Amino acid sequence: MKHSSKIIVFVSFLILTIFIGGCGFINKEDSKEAEIKQNFNKTLSMYPTKNLEDFYDKEGYRDEEFDKDDKGTWIINSKMIVEPKGEEMEARGMVLRINRNTRTAKGNFIIKRITENNKGIPDVKDKKYPVKMEHNKIIPTKQIKDKKLKKEIENFKFFVQYGNFKNLKDYKDGEISYNPNVPSYSAQYQLNNYDNNVKQLRKRYDIPTNQAPKLLLKGTGDLKGSSVGYKHLEFTFVENKKENIYFTDSINFNPSRGN
């Protein structure tokens, strides 16, 4: 009887230890998720910024990487990548460098196609069309004979102009990843097709699937803040060996050297 009591006490203690340890692990995961959300919050609070010229007056995170008189450059990038089954991968998007010192914005509309040769080696073909932004309008700086393409470029909208993350706090049960050695961090959430950002993407792009995407928030650099590293968003609709459909977006603030 005495022996049985000892076993019961030991097992009870073991269960309690596992439970407490489990709670600690869960709390740690929740804490890291909250930290990642906090890190992204300042960036995501800029969505939407309908007028791109507002970036001339937006301050970003500054550290010793910036020269004293450098106001910094915002680099925004949006692109849609589609690889249907049995077809080539095509990425269409734009990158714009918004220089706060010169109050000028230049970039490129980029079309990238990736195919594989008989040996399975990727063949990448890029076409870049230089652009500038004036009065919140995208203007090609070189002649484009293809009228349809020219219209696509002139009508292009960055995700920051229509995306909205005011409900970020409502995203729950994310898949959290953190590597302090790089450092890198990410949080991934399953969305549904009723999500406003998903609706906006479907409105603007021909997305050949009804599958709801996952949202990935991914970054590198110190979680407490750094101008070294990057942050980007990814809406992944389909991802496998035969088919890939996803949208990526980023807003980063960097020193203006070379921009």
Swiss-Prot record:
Membrane-topology descriptor: Lipid-anchor
Primary site of residence: membrane
Lipid-conjugated positions (S-diacylglycerol cysteine): C23
Signal peptide start-end: 1-22
Subcellular location: Cell membrane
Alphabetical UniProt keywords: Cell membrane, Lipoprotein, Membrane, Palmitate, Signal
Lipidated residues (N-palmitoyl cysteine): C23
GO cellular component: plasma membrane
Pfam families: DUF576
InterPro entries associated with the record: Csa, Csa_sf
Family, per entry: Belongs to the staphylococcal tandem lipoprotein family.
Annotated protein name in UniProt: Uncharacterized lipoprotein SERP2423
